[in-house]
Protein backbone atom coordinates (compact mmCIF):
# COMPACT_ATOMS: atom_id res chain seq x y z
CA UNK A 1 0.00 0.00 0.00
CA UNK A 2 1.46 3.37 -1.04
CA UNK A 3 1.84 6.35 1.29
CA UNK A 4 -0.75 8.29 -0.70
CA UNK A 5 -3.30 5.55 -0.21
CA UNK A 6 -2.60 5.45 3.55
CA UNK A 7 -3.04 9.24 3.83
CA UNK A 8 -6.34 9.05 2.00
CA UNK A 9 -7.66 6.36 4.31
CA UNK A 10 -6.52 8.28 7.41
CA UNK A 11 -8.16 11.49 6.21
CA UNK A 12 -11.32 9.57 5.45
CA UNK A 13 -11.52 8.17 9.01
CA UNK A 14 -10.74 11.59 10.51
CA UNK A 15 -13.51 13.21 8.49
CA UNK A 16 -16.01 10.54 9.54
CA UNK A 17 -15.06 10.95 13.23
CA UNK A 18 -15.44 14.75 13.14
CA UNK A 19 -18.74 14.39 11.39
CA UNK A 20 -19.99 12.07 14.19
CA UNK A 21 -18.91 14.55 16.87
CA UNK A 22 -20.74 17.49 15.33
CA UNK A 23 -23.78 15.30 14.73
CA UNK A 24 -24.14 14.95 18.50
CA UNK A 25 -24.29 18.71 18.94
CA UNK A 26 -26.82 19.68 16.31
CA UNK A 27 -30.02 18.13 15.12
CA UNK A 28 -29.05 18.12 11.41
CA UNK A 29 -28.87 15.60 8.58
CA UNK A 30 -25.49 14.02 8.99
CA UNK A 31 -25.25 12.71 5.46
CA UNK A 32 -23.76 9.38 4.53
CA UNK A 33 -20.31 8.02 3.84
CA UNK A 34 -19.28 4.62 2.57
CA UNK A 35 -16.55 3.05 4.62
CA UNK A 36 -14.97 -0.28 3.71
CA UNK A 37 -13.61 -1.89 6.82
CA UNK A 38 -10.97 -4.47 6.24
CA UNK A 39 -10.44 -5.29 9.90
CA UNK A 40 -12.78 -7.92 11.38
CA UNK A 41 -15.47 -6.24 13.48
CA UNK A 42 -15.67 -7.31 17.11
CA UNK A 43 -18.61 -5.48 18.67
CA UNK A 44 -19.05 -5.17 22.41
CA UNK A 45 -21.98 -3.91 24.43
CA UNK A 46 -21.40 -1.74 27.47
CA UNK A 47 -23.42 -2.07 30.65
CA UNK A 48 -26.91 -0.73 30.13
CA UNK A 49 -27.80 2.45 31.96
CA UNK A 50 -31.22 3.99 31.70
CA UNK A 51 -31.30 7.76 31.90
CA UNK A 52 -34.27 8.80 33.99
CA UNK A 53 -35.99 11.60 32.19
CA UNK A 54 -38.09 14.17 33.95
CA UNK A 55 -41.86 14.16 33.42
CA UNK A 56 -43.19 15.12 29.99
CA UNK A 57 -44.19 18.75 30.01
CA UNK A 58 -46.59 19.06 27.12
CA UNK A 59 -49.61 18.67 29.38
CA UNK A 60 -52.78 20.58 28.98
CA UNK A 61 -53.45 20.99 32.69
CA UNK A 62 -50.59 22.73 34.43
CA UNK A 63 -52.20 23.21 37.81
CA UNK A 64 -52.48 19.60 38.84
CA UNK A 65 -49.76 17.17 39.71
CA UNK A 66 -49.91 14.60 36.96
CA UNK A 67 -48.70 11.03 37.01
CA UNK A 68 -45.08 10.95 35.95
CA UNK A 69 -44.43 9.04 32.75
CA UNK A 70 -41.00 8.29 31.41
CA UNK A 71 -40.57 8.03 27.66
CA UNK A 72 -37.64 6.85 25.59
CA UNK A 73 -37.28 8.48 22.18
CA UNK A 74 -35.38 6.75 19.38
CA UNK A 75 -33.72 9.02 16.82
CA UNK A 76 -32.93 7.41 13.44
CA UNK A 77 -29.43 7.99 12.09
CA UNK A 78 -28.67 7.68 8.39
CA UNK A 79 -25.73 5.33 7.91
CA UNK A 80 -24.47 2.80 5.41
CA UNK A 81 -21.79 1.58 7.77
CA UNK A 82 -21.54 -2.17 7.13
CA UNK A 83 -18.91 -4.04 9.12
CA UNK A 84 -17.25 -7.10 7.80
CA UNK A 85 -18.72 -10.33 9.05
CA UNK A 86 -17.44 -11.32 12.42
CA UNK A 87 -18.46 -13.21 15.50
CA UNK A 88 -19.93 -11.08 18.26
CA UNK A 89 -18.35 -11.33 21.65
CA UNK A 90 -20.48 -12.79 24.43
CA UNK A 91 -22.36 -10.34 26.63
CA UNK A 92 -22.92 -10.73 30.37
CA UNK A 93 -26.60 -9.91 30.80
CA UNK A 94 -27.75 -8.49 34.08
CA UNK A 95 -30.29 -10.69 35.80
CA UNK A 96 -33.75 -9.24 35.29
CA UNK A 97 -35.83 -9.03 38.44
CA UNK A 98 -38.99 -11.09 38.18
CA UNK A 99 -42.23 -9.18 38.57
CA UNK A 100 -45.00 -10.62 40.74
CA UNK A 101 -48.67 -9.70 40.69
CA UNK A 102 -49.36 -10.01 44.40
CA UNK A 103 -47.74 -9.09 47.70
CA UNK A 104 -48.27 -9.31 51.45
CA UNK A 105 -46.71 -6.99 54.04
CA UNK A 106 -46.64 -7.24 57.82
CA UNK A 107 -44.98 -4.89 60.28
CA UNK A 108 -45.02 -4.42 64.06
CA UNK A 109 -43.68 -1.58 66.15
CA UNK A 110 -43.72 0.30 69.42
CA UNK A 111 -46.93 1.91 70.70
CA UNK A 112 -48.49 -1.48 69.88
CA UNK A 113 -48.46 -0.63 66.18
CA UNK A 114 -49.56 -3.22 63.63
CA UNK A 115 -49.39 -2.56 59.88
CA UNK A 116 -50.57 -5.18 57.37
CA UNK A 117 -51.34 -5.13 53.65
CA UNK A 118 -52.43 -7.80 51.19
CA UNK A 119 -52.79 -7.10 47.47
CA UNK A 120 -53.91 -9.75 44.98
CA UNK A 121 -54.83 -9.58 41.31
CA UNK A 122 -55.49 -12.28 38.76
CA UNK A 123 -56.35 -12.43 35.08
CA UNK A 124 -59.44 -14.59 34.57
CA UNK A 125 -58.82 -14.72 30.84
CA UNK A 126 -57.48 -12.51 28.09
CA UNK A 127 -60.01 -9.74 28.76
CA UNK A 128 -61.10 -10.06 32.39
CA UNK A 129 -59.32 -9.52 35.69
CA UNK A 130 -60.14 -9.31 39.39
CA UNK A 131 -58.25 -7.71 42.24
CA UNK A 132 -58.46 -6.89 45.90
CA UNK A 133 -56.57 -5.07 48.63
CA UNK A 134 -56.81 -5.46 52.40
CA UNK A 135 -55.12 -2.83 54.59
CA UNK A 136 -54.84 -2.46 58.35
CA UNK A 137 -53.06 0.07 60.54
CA UNK A 138 -53.58 0.26 64.29
CA UNK A 139 -51.90 1.45 67.45
CA UNK A 140 -52.65 0.78 71.11
CA UNK A 141 -51.56 4.31 71.95
CA UNK A 142 -49.37 5.35 74.83
CA UNK A 143 -48.61 9.06 74.35
CA UNK A 144 -47.27 10.46 77.61
CA UNK A 145 -49.35 12.60 79.99
CA UNK A 146 -52.73 12.06 78.32
CA UNK A 147 -55.97 12.01 80.28
CA UNK A 148 -57.89 9.90 77.74
CA UNK A 149 -57.26 6.82 75.61
CA UNK A 150 -55.46 7.47 72.30
CA UNK A 151 -55.58 4.11 70.49
CA UNK A 152 -56.79 3.91 66.88
CA UNK A 153 -57.69 1.34 64.20
CA UNK A 154 -58.03 1.71 60.45
CA UNK A 155 -59.03 -1.27 58.30
CA UNK A 156 -60.19 -1.24 54.68
CA UNK A 157 -61.06 -3.75 51.97
CA UNK A 158 -61.23 -2.84 48.26
CA UNK A 159 -62.37 -5.16 45.46
CA UNK A 160 -62.41 -4.66 41.69
CA UNK A 161 -63.48 -6.47 38.54
CA UNK A 162 -62.43 -5.27 35.09
CA UNK A 163 -63.15 -6.13 31.48
CA UNK A 164 -61.09 -4.86 28.54
CA UNK A 165 -62.41 -5.19 25.01
CA UNK A 166 -61.08 -3.91 21.70
CA UNK A 167 -63.24 -0.79 21.56
CA UNK A 168 -64.04 -0.19 25.23
CA UNK A 169 -63.17 -1.18 28.78
CA UNK A 170 -65.03 -1.07 32.06
CA UNK A 171 -64.63 -1.97 35.70
CA UNK A 172 -66.65 -2.05 38.91
CA UNK A 173 -65.30 -1.38 42.40
CA UNK A 174 -66.63 -2.03 45.88
CA UNK A 175 -65.16 -1.46 49.30
CA UNK A 176 -65.61 -1.17 53.04
CA UNK A 177 -63.66 0.83 55.62
CA UNK A 178 -63.81 0.66 59.43
CA UNK A 179 -62.04 3.28 61.55
CA UNK A 180 -61.83 3.81 65.31
CA UNK A 181 -60.38 6.99 66.82
CA UNK A 182 -60.50 8.69 70.20
CA UNK A 183 -61.05 12.35 71.08
CA UNK A 184 -58.08 12.36 73.44
CA UNK A 185 -57.33 16.10 73.18
CA UNK A 186 -58.06 17.21 76.76
CA UNK A 187 -55.70 19.78 78.25
CA UNK A 188 -53.89 18.58 81.36
CA UNK A 189 -55.53 21.36 83.39
CA UNK A 190 -59.03 20.21 82.45
CA UNK A 191 -61.50 20.58 85.36
CA UNK A 192 -58.78 21.76 87.73
CA UNK A 193 -61.25 24.33 89.06
CA UNK A 194 -63.13 21.57 90.90
CA UNK A 195 -62.37 21.70 94.61
CA UNK A 196 -62.37 17.95 95.15
CA UNK A 197 -59.70 16.08 93.11
CA UNK A 198 -61.91 13.00 93.19
CA UNK A 199 -64.72 14.93 91.50
CA UNK A 200 -62.27 15.91 88.77
CA UNK A 201 -61.15 12.33 88.31
CA UNK A 202 -64.74 11.07 88.24
CA UNK A 203 -65.58 13.62 85.54
CA UNK A 204 -62.62 12.55 83.40
CA UNK A 205 -63.45 8.86 83.89
CA UNK A 206 -67.02 9.51 82.74
CA UNK A 207 -65.84 10.67 79.32
CA UNK A 208 -66.05 8.03 76.60
CA UNK A 209 -63.87 9.47 73.80
CA UNK A 210 -64.27 6.70 71.23
CA UNK A 211 -65.64 7.39 67.74
CA UNK A 212 -66.21 4.81 64.99
CA UNK A 213 -66.49 5.55 61.27
CA UNK A 214 -67.83 3.11 58.70
CA UNK A 215 -67.87 3.58 54.95
CA UNK A 216 -69.29 1.44 52.14
CA UNK A 217 -68.94 2.29 48.46
CA UNK A 218 -69.83 0.90 45.06
CA UNK A 219 -68.58 2.45 41.85
CA UNK A 220 -67.56 1.89 38.28
CA UNK A 221 -65.95 3.35 35.21
CA UNK A 222 -66.32 2.83 31.47
CA UNK A 223 -64.18 4.24 28.66
CA UNK A 224 -64.48 3.93 24.89
CA UNK A 225 -62.18 4.32 21.90
CA UNK A 226 -62.98 5.93 18.56
CA UNK A 227 -66.20 7.40 19.93
CA UNK A 228 -67.65 10.79 20.82
CA UNK A 229 -68.37 9.31 24.23
CA UNK A 230 -65.00 9.12 25.97
CA UNK A 231 -65.63 7.87 29.47
CA UNK A 232 -67.92 7.96 32.48
CA UNK A 233 -67.47 7.24 36.17
CA UNK A 234 -70.02 6.86 38.94
CA UNK A 235 -69.90 6.13 42.65
CA UNK A 236 -72.27 5.62 45.56
CA UNK A 237 -70.93 6.16 49.08
CA UNK A 238 -72.62 5.51 52.43
CA UNK A 239 -70.89 6.87 55.52
CA UNK A 240 -71.94 6.54 59.17
CA UNK A 241 -70.54 6.86 62.69
CA UNK A 242 -71.19 5.69 66.26
CA UNK A 243 -73.45 8.66 67.06
CA UNK A 244 -76.22 8.05 64.55
CA UNK A 245 -74.79 10.25 61.81
CA UNK A 246 -75.51 9.11 58.27
CA UNK A 247 -74.46 10.42 54.88
CA UNK A 248 -75.14 9.27 51.32
CA UNK A 249 -73.36 10.56 48.27
CA UNK A 250 -73.82 9.66 44.62
CA UNK A 251 -72.18 11.18 41.57
CA UNK A 252 -71.88 10.44 37.87
CA UNK A 253 -69.30 12.11 35.61
CA UNK A 254 -69.56 11.45 31.85
CA UNK A 255 -67.16 12.99 29.30
CA UNK A 256 -67.64 13.53 25.56
CA UNK A 257 -65.17 14.85 23.01
CA UNK A 258 -64.47 15.20 19.31
CA UNK A 259 -62.22 17.06 16.88
CA UNK A 260 -62.99 19.80 14.36
CA UNK A 261 -60.22 20.76 11.94
CA UNK A 262 -57.66 19.18 14.25
CA UNK A 263 -58.87 21.06 17.33
CA UNK A 264 -60.21 19.14 20.32
CA UNK A 265 -63.60 19.97 21.82
CA UNK A 266 -64.48 18.33 25.13
CA UNK A 267 -67.32 18.53 27.61
CA UNK A 268 -67.38 17.15 31.14
CA UNK A 269 -70.74 16.67 32.83
CA UNK A 270 -71.37 16.08 36.52
CA UNK A 271 -74.33 15.29 38.73
CA UNK A 272 -73.33 15.20 42.41
CA UNK A 273 -75.89 14.43 45.13
CA UNK A 274 -75.15 14.66 48.86
CA UNK A 275 -77.57 14.07 51.72
CA UNK A 276 -77.03 13.43 55.41
CA UNK A 277 -77.99 14.08 59.00
CA UNK A 278 -76.60 14.41 62.54
CA UNK A 279 -78.70 13.37 65.52
CA UNK A 280 -78.03 16.63 67.38
CA UNK A 281 -76.00 19.81 67.31
CA UNK A 282 -73.06 20.54 69.62
CA UNK A 283 -75.31 21.74 72.44
CA UNK A 284 -77.67 18.78 72.06
CA UNK A 285 -80.78 20.75 71.20
CA UNK A 286 -81.76 20.04 67.58
CA UNK A 287 -80.96 17.59 64.80
CA UNK A 288 -79.03 18.70 61.72
CA UNK A 289 -80.11 17.75 58.20
CA UNK A 290 -78.37 18.74 54.99
CA UNK A 291 -78.60 17.96 51.30
CA UNK A 292 -77.20 19.40 48.07
CA UNK A 293 -77.47 18.47 44.41
CA UNK A 294 -74.93 20.04 42.07
CA UNK A 295 -75.34 19.79 38.31
CA UNK A 296 -72.56 21.03 36.08
CA UNK A 297 -71.21 21.13 32.54
CA UNK A 298 -67.62 22.06 31.68
CA UNK A 299 -67.07 22.58 27.93
CA UNK A 300 -63.58 23.30 26.62
CA UNK A 301 -61.83 24.00 23.33
CA UNK A 302 -58.15 23.19 22.78
CA UNK A 303 -56.19 25.44 20.44
CA UNK A 304 -52.65 24.50 19.40
CA UNK A 305 -50.19 26.37 17.21
CA UNK A 306 -46.49 25.64 17.18
CA UNK A 307 -45.30 25.84 20.80
CA UNK A 308 -48.51 27.38 22.15
CA UNK A 309 -51.37 25.34 23.63
CA UNK A 310 -54.48 27.06 24.97
CA UNK A 311 -57.43 25.36 26.64
CA UNK A 312 -60.44 27.67 26.59
CA UNK A 313 -63.23 26.47 28.84
CA UNK A 314 -65.87 27.39 31.36
CA UNK A 315 -67.74 25.71 34.18
CA UNK A 316 -71.47 26.18 34.59
CA UNK A 317 -73.00 24.79 37.80
CA UNK A 318 -76.48 24.80 39.28
CA UNK A 319 -76.57 24.02 43.01
CA UNK A 320 -79.76 23.06 44.82
CA UNK A 321 -79.98 23.22 48.61
CA UNK A 322 -82.47 20.42 49.19
CA UNK A 323 -83.20 21.40 52.81
CA UNK A 324 -83.57 25.17 52.46
CA UNK A 325 -84.72 25.58 48.82
CA UNK A 326 -81.83 27.96 48.25
CA UNK A 327 -80.74 27.35 44.66
CA UNK A 328 -77.81 29.13 43.00
CA UNK A 329 -76.18 29.34 39.58
CA UNK A 330 -72.39 29.63 39.19
CA UNK A 331 -70.11 30.39 36.24
CA UNK A 332 -66.38 29.70 36.47
CA UNK A 333 -63.40 30.32 34.22
CA UNK A 334 -61.47 27.22 33.18
CA UNK A 335 -58.66 28.54 31.03
CA UNK A 336 -55.12 27.17 30.83
CA UNK A 337 -52.21 27.94 28.53
CA UNK A 338 -48.69 26.61 28.01
CA UNK A 339 -45.87 27.94 25.86
CA UNK A 340 -42.70 26.00 25.19
CA UNK A 341 -39.99 28.64 25.40
CA UNK A 342 -37.15 26.21 24.75
CA UNK A 343 -38.72 22.96 23.66
CA UNK A 344 -39.24 20.73 26.67
CA UNK A 345 -36.41 22.40 28.58
CA UNK A 346 -38.43 25.45 29.64
CA UNK A 347 -42.21 25.82 29.55
CA UNK A 348 -44.23 28.78 30.76
CA UNK A 349 -47.80 28.20 31.88
CA UNK A 350 -50.72 30.19 33.21
CA UNK A 351 -54.38 29.74 33.97
CA UNK A 352 -57.57 30.93 35.59
CA UNK A 353 -59.72 28.14 36.98
CA UNK A 354 -62.68 27.78 39.30
CA UNK A 355 -65.20 25.16 40.34
CA UNK A 356 -67.91 24.24 42.82
CA UNK A 357 -66.56 21.90 45.50
CA UNK A 358 -68.95 19.51 47.22
CA UNK A 359 -67.88 19.18 50.86
CA UNK A 360 -68.97 16.14 52.85
CA UNK A 361 -68.84 14.78 56.39
CA UNK A 362 -66.68 11.87 55.24
CA UNK A 363 -64.15 14.18 53.57
CA UNK A 364 -63.86 16.26 56.74
CA UNK A 365 -63.30 13.18 58.92
CA UNK A 366 -60.47 11.99 56.67
CA UNK A 367 -58.79 15.39 56.90
CA UNK A 368 -59.29 15.72 60.65
CA UNK A 369 -60.28 12.54 62.52
CA UNK A 370 -61.32 14.56 65.58
CA UNK A 371 -64.25 16.59 64.24
CA UNK A 372 -67.49 16.38 66.20
CA UNK A 373 -70.58 14.76 64.62
CA UNK A 374 -72.33 18.14 64.70
CA UNK A 375 -70.97 19.85 61.60
CA UNK A 376 -72.49 22.37 59.23
CA UNK A 377 -72.04 20.94 55.72
CA UNK A 378 -72.09 23.21 52.66
CA UNK A 379 -70.27 23.44 49.30
CA UNK A 380 -67.37 25.80 48.62
CA UNK A 381 -67.61 28.34 45.81
CA UNK A 382 -64.08 28.31 44.38
CA UNK A 383 -64.51 31.49 42.34
CA UNK A 384 -61.13 31.53 40.65
CA UNK A 385 -57.52 30.48 40.99
CA UNK A 386 -55.27 32.66 38.82
CA UNK A 387 -51.71 31.41 38.45
CA UNK A 388 -48.54 31.73 36.39
CA UNK A 389 -45.56 29.43 36.46
CA UNK A 390 -42.44 28.12 34.81
CA UNK A 391 -41.25 24.53 34.67
CA UNK A 392 -38.72 22.50 32.80
CA UNK A 393 -35.36 20.81 33.02
CA UNK A 394 -32.15 22.13 34.49
CA UNK A 395 -30.44 19.01 33.21
CA UNK A 396 -31.55 15.80 31.56
CA UNK A 397 -32.39 14.27 34.93
CA UNK A 398 -33.27 17.39 36.96
CA UNK A 399 -36.65 19.11 36.70
CA UNK A 400 -38.06 22.21 38.35
CA UNK A 401 -41.42 23.91 38.79
CA UNK A 402 -42.16 27.37 40.23
CA UNK A 403 -45.62 28.86 40.52
CA UNK A 404 -47.41 31.88 41.91
CA UNK A 405 -51.17 32.08 42.36
CA UNK A 406 -54.04 34.12 43.76
CA UNK A 407 -57.15 32.23 44.82
CA UNK A 408 -60.59 33.46 45.87
CA UNK A 409 -62.88 31.01 47.69
CA UNK A 410 -66.30 31.81 49.11
CA UNK A 411 -67.36 29.40 51.84
CA UNK A 412 -63.91 27.91 52.35
CA UNK A 413 -63.99 25.41 55.22
CA UNK A 414 -61.56 25.69 58.16
CA UNK A 415 -61.36 23.72 61.42
CA UNK A 416 -61.74 25.35 64.83
CA UNK A 417 -61.55 23.78 68.29
CA UNK A 418 -64.93 23.39 69.98
CA UNK A 419 -65.52 25.23 73.28
CA UNK A 420 -66.12 23.60 76.66
CA UNK A 421 -69.03 24.72 78.82
CA UNK A 422 -69.86 22.79 81.99
CA UNK A 423 -73.53 23.73 81.56
CA UNK A 424 -73.72 22.11 78.13
CA UNK A 425 -76.50 19.49 78.29
CA UNK A 426 -74.62 17.49 75.67
CA UNK A 427 -72.28 15.20 77.62
CA UNK A 428 -71.03 13.08 74.72
CA UNK A 429 -67.35 12.24 74.52
CA UNK A 430 -66.64 15.07 72.07
CA UNK A 431 -68.28 17.89 74.09
CA UNK A 432 -65.40 18.70 76.47
CA UNK A 433 -63.38 21.02 74.26
CA UNK A 434 -61.64 18.02 72.69
CA UNK A 435 -63.17 18.09 69.20
CA UNK A 436 -63.38 20.41 66.20
CA UNK A 437 -66.08 22.18 64.26
CA UNK A 438 -66.08 23.49 60.70
CA UNK A 439 -66.48 27.19 59.91
CA UNK A 440 -66.86 28.88 56.52
CA UNK A 441 -65.61 32.22 55.27
CA UNK A 442 -64.55 34.06 52.15
CA UNK A 443 -60.80 33.46 52.04
CA UNK A 444 -58.35 34.95 49.56
CA UNK A 445 -55.01 33.16 49.32
CA UNK A 446 -51.78 34.34 47.72
CA UNK A 447 -49.46 31.39 47.22
CA UNK A 448 -45.93 30.68 46.01
CA UNK A 449 -44.78 27.17 45.21
CA UNK A 450 -41.40 25.75 44.22
CA UNK A 451 -40.29 22.21 43.45
CA UNK A 452 -37.10 20.47 42.39
CA UNK A 453 -36.74 16.81 41.43
CA UNK A 454 -33.55 15.00 40.50
CA UNK A 455 -32.49 11.48 39.57
CA UNK A 456 -28.76 11.70 40.12
CA UNK A 457 -28.31 8.15 38.85
CA UNK A 458 -30.32 4.99 38.50
CA UNK A 459 -29.72 4.46 42.24
CA UNK A 460 -30.31 7.92 43.74
CA UNK A 461 -33.34 10.21 43.51
CA UNK A 462 -34.14 13.41 45.39
CA UNK A 463 -37.04 15.82 45.61
CA UNK A 464 -37.90 18.96 47.55
CA UNK A 465 -40.86 21.33 47.46
CA UNK A 466 -42.15 24.25 49.47
CA UNK A 467 -45.31 26.35 49.64
CA UNK A 468 -45.83 29.78 51.17
CA UNK A 469 -49.41 30.99 51.69
CA UNK A 470 -50.78 34.35 52.77
CA UNK A 471 -54.46 34.35 53.81
CA UNK A 472 -57.00 37.13 54.01
CA UNK A 473 -60.38 36.43 55.63
CA UNK A 474 -63.60 38.45 55.61
CA UNK A 475 -65.30 37.56 58.90
CA UNK A 476 -62.97 35.18 60.72
CA UNK A 477 -60.23 36.75 62.84
CA UNK A 478 -57.70 34.25 61.46
CA UNK A 479 -57.44 31.52 58.86
CA UNK A 480 -57.71 28.95 61.63
CA UNK A 481 -55.38 25.93 61.47
CA UNK A 482 -53.95 26.89 58.07
CA UNK A 483 -50.12 27.10 58.04
CA UNK A 484 -48.34 29.78 56.05
CA UNK A 485 -45.26 27.68 55.28
CA UNK A 486 -44.87 24.01 54.37
CA UNK A 487 -41.68 22.30 53.16
CA UNK A 488 -41.10 18.64 52.29
CA UNK A 489 -38.13 16.69 50.94
CA UNK A 490 -37.32 13.07 50.19
CA UNK A 491 -34.23 11.05 49.27
CA UNK A 492 -34.23 7.45 48.02
CA UNK A 493 -31.21 5.40 47.05
CA UNK A 494 -30.09 1.86 46.38
CA UNK A 495 -27.01 1.06 48.44
CA UNK A 496 -26.33 -2.29 46.75
CA UNK A 497 -28.40 -4.76 44.78
CA UNK A 498 -29.70 -6.06 48.11
CA UNK A 499 -29.86 -2.97 50.31
CA UNK A 500 -31.90 0.20 49.83
CA UNK A 501 -32.78 3.16 52.03
CA UNK A 502 -34.68 6.42 52.04
CA UNK A 503 -35.52 9.45 54.12
CA UNK A 504 -38.22 12.10 54.14
CA UNK A 505 -38.55 15.30 56.12
CA UNK A 506 -41.30 17.85 56.33
CA UNK A 507 -41.79 21.17 58.06
CA UNK A 508 -45.12 22.79 58.90
CA UNK A 509 -45.28 26.37 60.09
CA UNK A 510 -47.28 27.92 62.91
CA UNK A 511 -51.07 27.70 63.00
CA UNK A 512 -53.66 29.40 65.18
CA UNK A 513 -56.71 28.14 67.06
CA UNK A 514 -58.97 29.22 69.92
CA UNK A 515 -59.15 27.68 73.40
CA UNK A 516 -62.48 28.30 75.13
CA UNK A 517 -63.32 27.05 78.65
CA UNK A 518 -66.36 28.13 80.65
CA UNK A 519 -67.31 26.97 84.16
CA UNK A 520 -68.52 28.51 87.41
CA UNK A 521 -65.01 29.36 88.62
CA UNK A 522 -63.11 29.50 85.35
CA UNK A 523 -63.68 31.50 82.20
CA UNK A 524 -60.99 31.45 79.49
CA UNK A 525 -61.03 32.53 75.87
CA UNK A 526 -57.66 32.85 74.17
CA UNK A 527 -56.07 32.58 70.77
CA UNK A 528 -53.44 29.84 70.82
CA UNK A 529 -50.50 29.61 68.43
CA UNK A 530 -49.50 26.05 67.64
CA UNK A 531 -45.74 25.77 67.25
CA UNK A 532 -44.21 24.87 63.92
CA UNK A 533 -42.82 21.36 63.73
CA UNK A 534 -40.23 19.34 61.89
CA UNK A 535 -40.59 15.60 61.27
CA UNK A 536 -37.90 13.19 60.08
CA UNK A 537 -38.73 9.72 58.74
CA UNK A 538 -36.33 7.05 57.47
CA UNK A 539 -36.46 3.49 56.20
CA UNK A 540 -33.96 0.76 55.33
CA UNK A 541 -34.71 -2.45 53.46
CA UNK A 542 -32.95 -5.68 52.54
CA UNK A 543 -34.00 -7.77 49.53
CA UNK A 544 -33.35 -11.33 50.60
CA UNK A 545 -34.45 -12.57 47.17
CA UNK A 546 -36.91 -11.65 44.41
CA UNK A 547 -39.82 -12.49 46.71
CA UNK A 548 -38.85 -11.61 50.27
CA UNK A 549 -37.84 -8.17 51.57
CA UNK A 550 -37.26 -7.12 55.16
CA UNK A 551 -37.51 -3.49 56.27
CA UNK A 552 -37.31 -1.17 59.24
CA UNK A 553 -39.01 2.22 59.36
CA UNK A 554 -38.63 5.10 61.75
CA UNK A 555 -41.04 8.04 62.09
CA UNK A 556 -40.68 11.29 64.03
CA UNK A 557 -37.04 10.43 64.66
CA UNK A 558 -36.39 13.89 66.10
CA UNK A 559 -38.93 12.98 68.81
CA UNK A 560 -40.62 16.36 68.65
CA UNK A 561 -43.63 16.57 70.93
CA UNK A 562 -45.59 18.65 68.45
CA UNK A 563 -49.33 19.10 68.08
CA UNK A 564 -50.89 18.64 64.68
CA UNK A 565 -54.18 19.89 66.13
CA UNK A 566 -54.78 21.87 69.31
CA UNK A 567 -54.23 19.65 72.40
CA UNK A 568 -53.48 16.63 70.19
CA UNK A 569 -49.80 15.70 70.64
CA UNK A 570 -48.44 13.02 68.33
CA UNK A 571 -46.54 9.86 69.17
CA UNK A 572 -42.80 10.23 69.75
CA UNK A 573 -40.15 8.11 68.02
CA UNK A 574 -41.92 5.30 66.18
CA UNK A 575 -40.10 2.20 64.92
CA UNK A 576 -41.69 -0.41 62.69
CA UNK A 577 -40.03 -3.72 61.78
CA UNK A 578 -41.53 -5.91 59.08
CA UNK A 579 -41.28 -7.89 55.87
CA UNK A 580 -42.92 -7.99 52.46
CA UNK A 581 -43.46 -11.12 50.36
CA UNK A 582 -44.33 -11.13 46.64
CA UNK A 583 -46.01 -14.08 44.99
CA UNK A 584 -48.10 -15.41 42.11
CA UNK A 585 -50.92 -17.91 42.13
Name these PLM-found stretches:
Residues 1-27, 346, 491, 573, ...:
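Bacterial Sec-dependent N-terminal signal peptides
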Residues 22-94:
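N-terminal periplasmic/intermembrane-space "pro-region" immediately following the signal or transit peptide
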Residues 84-86, 95-104, 108-145, 149-155:
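Outer-membrane beta-barrel translocator/receptor signature
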Residues 99, 107, 309-313, 317-585:
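Exposed, low-structure sequence patches enriched in small/polar residues
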Residues 118-122, 132, 157-163, 218-224, ...:
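Residues on the lipid-exposed face of transmembrane beta-strands in outer-membrane beta-barrel proteins
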Residues 122-144, 266-270, 290-321, 455-470, ...:
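Surface-exposed extracellular loop regions of Gram-negative outer-membrane beta-barrel proteins
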Residues 139-152, 173-249:
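Flexible loop and strand-edge segments within Gram-negative outer membrane beta-barrel domains
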Residues 203-219, 235-306, 437:
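Outer-membrane beta-barrel transmembrane domain signature of Gram-negative proteins
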Amino acid sequence: MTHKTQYKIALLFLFAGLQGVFAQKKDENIGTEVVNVVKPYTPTISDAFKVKETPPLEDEDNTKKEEIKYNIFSFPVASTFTPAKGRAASVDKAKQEKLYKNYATLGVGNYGTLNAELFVTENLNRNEYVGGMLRHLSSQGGIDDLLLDDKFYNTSLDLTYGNQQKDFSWNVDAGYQHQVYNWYGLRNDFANDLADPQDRQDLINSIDPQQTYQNIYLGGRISAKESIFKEASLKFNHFSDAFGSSENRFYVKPTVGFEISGNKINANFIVDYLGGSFEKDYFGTTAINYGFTNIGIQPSFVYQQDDLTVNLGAGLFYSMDNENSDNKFFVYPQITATYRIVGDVMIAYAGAEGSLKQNSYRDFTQENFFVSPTLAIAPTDQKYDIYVGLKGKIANNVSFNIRGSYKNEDGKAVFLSNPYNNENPNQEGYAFGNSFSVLYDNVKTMSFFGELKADFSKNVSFGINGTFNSYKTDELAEAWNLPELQVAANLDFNITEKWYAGASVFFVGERKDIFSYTSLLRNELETVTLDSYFDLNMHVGYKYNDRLTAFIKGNNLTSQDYQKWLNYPVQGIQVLLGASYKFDF
